[in-house]
């Protein structure tokens, strides 16, 4: 039941909306009253219907009209079979019996003469009032312009059918399924714009659908379209589909009170959520309802509903979304907010009517006097944008009704007010016998006779004059004393018609105006010379062409022209005269390749005016004429105030030219005075601007941004593939700017003010402006010029016309700066473009993938990528996306995704399998979202070599052998010490480090005391690129093992350094592990170690070696110490997994391990800071457990933070850490994430002994 009520409610709502628009068919006969009110009225006549138009202007006219006249489309109404004038002044109209598409010619004629715009004039004693317009249309219904289309929709999806047709009145759209009206269900949504939406599609919805349009004229059926329902998930196109807006809202303009539907249908898998917001952030009005699930319905649109509405569709459980925006513009018909008031004025006084109107867009105002449009003249002025009407020197002819009519695109409104002219008794009559006699081209003598009645009461006269022709003429007046009846008027324009009249004044008031006197001022010599154009059709001729002078410069009728010419450097000048109706002359029998000077002057009946400036031209040479084009013919230039319009005709043999070159320059004051600068025949002088290259088909070009009243020279040459041709030259002045002190004609409108551009989307920009703050003309529309910023190609500039004060410009490129300029247009005149406003469109997803993707294998597990940015990024690239897989048939979400920053253009992908084919594709992402991926590219990784395939067991064997050799070496050293009992221990050495205790030592060759020793055990932490250094030389590639009193430990720093030392039995328990330590710097002998103990560089097994050495030492330490070996035995093992990673200790020395002579007490320095390892782990834990600085100076011990054993994640390389930017390329290198060290492998502690 609720569903049925919803369907009926929509039909009732549609009926009410049509009633509000005045588009419902009328009953059999209806009366429509026409008055001075809002309009126009729209009357639609259906079949067999009639209407009576009643001219009800009695209230306005202060009584019933004495006479009513009707007009149709501005002409007098003629009666016919379907139109009759009734005795009461009303008009009866009926619709013809035949339809519009009938074959009866008579019916078609009656149909055409019936439709039109009807208005009436009501005549009364006070004046005439014009009614509003009634537009009469006959009901029609056109064929469908859009038929529904068949479609396949999955279950629970959304189906949408659409049809379009036009008719009067607007047809009601219904839908049928299998030729039966669709049931009234909430799932079936019928929109007024001819759309049927079927939500949650079911199997029962399958069938044939058609659209039915019905109005008072007829009923029409559309073509049928089938709906096929498929199983959910069976359509591959919709499986996992991203969110897409299937039906987006459209920009809509409606009149206030009409309904509007903002439709939005989205599709995705799963079904998306749809929401609406206003772009300006304001809340959506509460009277806006949701029709169906995703559509907005505004039943009665008001100006407050205007704005941009954004539909957003979100895919559930994802961040994918799509948006669509549309502007709703609600127009408001004009309404008179301040009507003019009735006035009563005495003769010769001033009347002022004020009218104000509101509406959207802002209405334009014009005035009627007794039903006739009022044209401003000298006495009647329209001010304030049409809102004020001022009438001076009121006469009886000015009495009547004045109507203020406001008009915009939504309708009209009017208000009327009468003007009564009061004539007092005893006023003088009008002056008589007014005459105007021309004295010269600029002066007229006006005379009159005194009035016949009450002449003795006259205290003075007023003389009024204005131009007799043209519109918007300014009226001038002079006050004249009573003692004279004539006046000489000066400063008139030559060859111009003027109208004069006189008014007499007494103490009681003014008389009527006298009869006008017309006069034509005398001719004068022309105030300027025609502007010349010179060209040579052959070597011995010069064609001279000019344009006729305008009437403002000719000062009369031009009767003749005089052309003077001669060689450039000779005094002899020839002249010839031609009639005034000629505009060109050919000078014959001239010398080839010579410079001639030419000038022209125009003559009227008063004589010749000033001649033009000398203009020089070189005739072509007689040789090599086959390749040199002649000058263009008939070069004409029409001068404007700030531009020159250049037009021409092709030269002889136009097929031989490739185009034209146009030059122009401003002639300086000195040049203008002497005019002796030779122009040259083929471009041998410098020009301010040019050349502008034009195609051969172009025959007109306008030079803009010129200075008014300046002398310019223009040169046009034709060129071909060989060279430039001969020039056609013109010299003349632009029009002068109007002088503010003199009476001027109304100038062009000013550019709009407050031009503002606002980005609307990635492809559209809103441009808004306001009417000029001051203008003397009525602005009818505007032109918007726009193009990409900094554009030099004029063919890419676009122009739009707008009647309002804003426009939405679409079809733009994303993330592109555009420049805009707006121009105002008056009636028959165009204003200049205003200042340029710049604005960029919003960014969007990239339209193209990264370009020039190149792949190259580096190692069996590494591939390097190089690419270039997308050709159409549509914004700033913030991230590049790399997808790769060894199986290109896998779904895209199963590929490995790597990301890198937007300013990097190369990368390395690690962790790949050797000798495997990988497929790569790349995409780019802006802040809006990702763009498309590139096409697939494949690469095969390298095969593993022998060194690459060396297994861990072989490496382990090598390391075990090295360790065993090291243990044997130490055992031999201990045995040798026991057999050397005859040697005496050095005083001052003991296990406790106190002087006087005996000690044993091996002979060792002391190294340079000034070079520090560096002994490191590298961890698996990858060296940072900035810590890289080249491998040491052979001399530096050695380590030393010193005697019992080991040398100092170097101050090598780095997070990857590890150090190990051990002593005889009773060695300490190893305590903890450290990321690295900074040990005291010292000097002294270094322990030596043979190179055989060093593992191969780059084996990557340092951590395993560390564990093996540690286990061997630990097992040796379990033996019970011998009393004979109580002295400290110390050695350091140096193992580098990569010598190139050692940066702090580049000067390592490797010395042979052979017996040396024992050191004496005198040669061996006393120890300082030597540690007895027999004290066990307690001492070591006490000294190193905190890893905090305990001393200062040379014996400090500083540990770096224990960070190597902690896990590390590189968030900037998520979701995979297998990528490293290649150093040395455009990518900036990044430090790789250090690998985690297993806690099950112990780390060797560090012992320190220093000999100061």
Swiss-Prot record:
Residue spans crossing the bilayer: 957-977
Membrane topology of the entry: Single-pass type I membrane protein
Sequence ranges assigned to domain Fibronectin type-III in this UniProt record: 430-524, 526-622, 631-742, 751-844, 849-944
Domain of life: Eukaryota
Region (Disordered): 669-688
One GO CC term, this protein: plasma membrane
Modified positions (Phosphothreonine) in chain numbering: 994
Locations listed in the record: Cell membrane
Cystines in this chain: 55-120, 163-211, 264-311, 355-404
Record's keyword annotation contains Membrane: yes
Topology feature Cytoplasmic, residues: 978-1252
Range of residues in the leader sequence: 1-22
Xref: SMART domains: FN3, IG, IGc2
Alphabetized UniProt keyword annotations: Cell membrane, Disulfide bond, Glycoprotein, Immunoglobulin domain, Membrane, Phosphoprotein, Repeat, Signal, Transmembrane, Transmembrane helix
Tissues and organs where the protein is expressed, per its UniProt entry: Expressed in skeletal muscle, heart and brain. Brain expression is hippocampus-specific.
Topological region Extracellular: 23-956
Protein name according to UniProt: Immunoglobulin superfamily DCC subclass member 4
Organism this protein belongs to: Mus musculus
């Amino acid at each position: 039941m609720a569903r049925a009520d919803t369907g009926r409610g929509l039909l009732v709502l549609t009926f009410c909306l049509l009633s509000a628009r005045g588009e419902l068919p009328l009953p059999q006969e209806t009366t429509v009253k026409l008055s001075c009110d809002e309009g126009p009225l729209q009357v639609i006549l259906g079949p067999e219907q009639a209407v009576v138009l009643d001219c009800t202007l009695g209230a306005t006219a202060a009584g019933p009209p004495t006479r009513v006249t009707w007009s149709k489309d501005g002409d007098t109404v003629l009666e016919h079979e379907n139109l009759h004038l009734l005795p009461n002044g009303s008009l009866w109209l009926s619709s013809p019996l035949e339809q519009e598409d009938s074959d009866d010619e008579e019916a078609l004629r009656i149909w055409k003469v019936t439709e039109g715009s009807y208005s009436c004039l009501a005549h009364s004693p006070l004046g005439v009032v014009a009614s509003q317009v009634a537009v009469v249309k006959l009901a029609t219904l056109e064929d469908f312009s859009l038929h529904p289309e068949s479609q396949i929709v999955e279950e629970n999806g959304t189906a949408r059918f659409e049809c379009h047709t036009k008719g009067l009145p607007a047809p009601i759209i219904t839908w049928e399924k299998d030729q039966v009206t669709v049931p009234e269900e909430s799932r079936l949504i019928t929109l007024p714009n001819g759309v049927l939406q079927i939500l949650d599609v079911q199997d029962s919805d399958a069938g044939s659908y058609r659209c039915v349009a019905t109005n008072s004229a007829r009923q029409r059926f559309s073509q049928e379209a089938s709906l096929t329902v498929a199983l959910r998930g069976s359509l591959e196109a919709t499986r996992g589909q991203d969110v897409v807006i299937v039906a987006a809202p459209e920009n809509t303009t409606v009149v206030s009170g009409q309904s509007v539907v903002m439709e939005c249908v989205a599709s995705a898998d799963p079904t998306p959520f749809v929401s609406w917001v206003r772009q300006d952030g304001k809340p959506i009005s509460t009277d806006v309802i949701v029709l169906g699930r995703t559509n907005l319905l505004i039943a009665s649109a008001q100006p407050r509903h205007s704005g941009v509405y954004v539909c957003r569709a979100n895919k559930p459980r994802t961040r994918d979304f799509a948006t669509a925006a549309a502007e709703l513009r609600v127009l408001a018909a004009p309404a008179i907010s301040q009507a003019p008031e009735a006035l009563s004025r005495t003769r010769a006084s001033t009347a002022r009517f004020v009218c104000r109107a509101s509406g959207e867009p802002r209405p334009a105002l014009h005035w009627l006097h007794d039903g006739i449009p009022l044209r401003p003249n000298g006495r009647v002025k329209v001010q304030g944008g049409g809102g004020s009407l001022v009438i001076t020197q009121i006469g009886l002819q000015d009495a009547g009704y004045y109507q203020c009519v406001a008009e915009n695109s939504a309708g009209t409104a009017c208000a009327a007010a009468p003007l009564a002219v009061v004539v007092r008794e005893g006023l003088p009559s009008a002056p008589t016998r007014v005459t105007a006699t021309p004295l010269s081209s600029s002066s007229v003598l006006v005379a009159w006779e005194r009035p016949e009645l009450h002449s003795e009461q006259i205290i003075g006269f007023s003389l009024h004059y204005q131009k007799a022709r043209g519109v918007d003429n300014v009226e001038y007046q002079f006050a004249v004393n009573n003692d004279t009846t004539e006046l000489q008027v000066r400063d008139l324009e030559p060859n111009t018609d003027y109208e004069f009249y006189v008014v007499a004044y007494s103490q009681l008031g003014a008389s009527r105006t006298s009869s006008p006197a017309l006069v034509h001022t005398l001719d004068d010599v022309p105030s300027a010379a025609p502007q010349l154009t010179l060209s040579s059709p052959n070597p011995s001729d010069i064609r001279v062409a000019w344009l006729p002078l305008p009437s403002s410069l000719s000062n009369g009728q031009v009767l003749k022209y005089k052309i003077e010419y001669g060689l450039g450097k000779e005094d002899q000048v020839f002249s010839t005269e031609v009639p005034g109706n000629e505009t060109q002359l050919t000078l014959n029998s001239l010398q080839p390749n010579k410079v001639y000077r030419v000038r022209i002057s125009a003559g009227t009946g008063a004589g010749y005016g000033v001649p033009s400036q000398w203009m020089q031209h070189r005739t072509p040479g007689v040789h090599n004429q086959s390749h040199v084009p002649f000058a263009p013919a008939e070069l004409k230039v029409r001068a404007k105030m700030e531009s020159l319009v250049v037009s021409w005709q092709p030269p002889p043999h136009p097929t031989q030219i490739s185009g034209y070159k146009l030059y122009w320059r401003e002639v300086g004051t000195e040049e203008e005075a002497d005019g002796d600068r030779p122009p040259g025949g083929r471009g041998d002088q410098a020009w301010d601007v040019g050349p502008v290259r034009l195609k051969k088909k172009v025959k007109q070009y306008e030079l803009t941004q010129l200075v008014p009243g300046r002398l310019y020279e223009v040169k046009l040459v034709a060129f071909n593939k060989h060279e430039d041709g001969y020039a056609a030259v013109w010299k003349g002045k632009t029009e002068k700017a109007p002088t503010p002190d003199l009476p001027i004609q109304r100038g062009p409108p000013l550019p709009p003010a407050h031009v503002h551009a606002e980005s609307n989307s990635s492809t559209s920009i809103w441009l808004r402006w306001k009417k000029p703050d001051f203008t003397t003309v009525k602005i009818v529309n505007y032109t918007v010029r726009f193009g990409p910023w900094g554009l030099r190609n004029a063919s890419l500039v676009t122009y739009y016309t707008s009647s309002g004060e804003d426009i939405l410009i679409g079809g733009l490129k994303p993330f592109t700066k555009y420049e805009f300029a707006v121009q105002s247009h008056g009636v028959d005149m165009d204003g200049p473009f205003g200042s340029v406003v710049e604005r960029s469109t919003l960014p969007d997803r990239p339209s193209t993938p990264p370009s020039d993707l190149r792949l190259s294998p580096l190692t069996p597990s590494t591939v390097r990528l190089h690419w270039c940015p997308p050709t159409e990024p549509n914004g700033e690239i913030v991230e590049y996306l790399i997808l790769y897989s060894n199986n290109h048939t896998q779904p895209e979400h199963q590929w490995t995704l790597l990301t890198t920053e937007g300013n990097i253009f190369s990368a390395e992908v690690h962790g790949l399998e050797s000798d495997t084919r990988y497929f790569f594709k790349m995409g780019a992402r802006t802040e809006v979202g990702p763009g498309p991926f590139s096409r697939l590219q494949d690469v095969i990784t390298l095969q593993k070599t022998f060194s690459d395939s060396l297994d861990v067991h072989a490496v382990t064997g090598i390391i075990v052998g090295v360790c065993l050799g090291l243990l044997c070496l130490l055992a031999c050293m201990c045995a040798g010490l026991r057999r050397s009992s005859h040697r005496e221990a050095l005083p001052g050495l003991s296990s406790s480090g106190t002087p006087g205790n005996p000690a044993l030592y091996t002979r060792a060759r002391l190294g340079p005391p000034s070079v520090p020793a560096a002994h490191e055990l590298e961890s698996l932490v990858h060296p940072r690129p900035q810590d890289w250094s080249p491998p040491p030389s052979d001399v530096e590639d050695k380590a030393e093992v010193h005697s019992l009193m080991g040398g100092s430990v170097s101050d090598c720093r780095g997070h990857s350094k590890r150090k190990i030392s051990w002593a005889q039995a009773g060695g300490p328990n190893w305590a903890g592990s450290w990321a690295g330590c900074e040990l005291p710097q010292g000097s002294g002998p270094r322990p030596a170690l043979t190179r055989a103990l060093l593992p191969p560089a780059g084996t990557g097994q340092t951590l395993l070696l560390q564990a093996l050495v540690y286990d061997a030492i630990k097992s040796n330490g379990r033996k019970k110490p011998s009393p004979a070996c109580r002295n400290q035995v110390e050695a350091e093992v140096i193992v580098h997994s990569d010598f190139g990673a050692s940066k702090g200790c580049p000067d390592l020395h490797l010395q042979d391990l052979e017996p040396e002579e024992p050191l004496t007490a005198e040669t061996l320095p006393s120890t300082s800071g030597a540690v007895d390892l027999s004290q066990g782990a307690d001492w070591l834990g006490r000294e190193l457990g905190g890893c905090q600085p305990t001393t200062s100076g040379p014996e400090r011990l500083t540990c770096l933070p224990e960070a190597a054993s902690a896990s590390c994640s590189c968030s900037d390389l998520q979701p995979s850490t297998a990528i490293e930017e290649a150093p040395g390329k455009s990518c900036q290198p990044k430090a790789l994430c250090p690998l985690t060290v297993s806690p099950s492998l112990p780390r060797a502690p560090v012992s320190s002994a220093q000999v100061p």
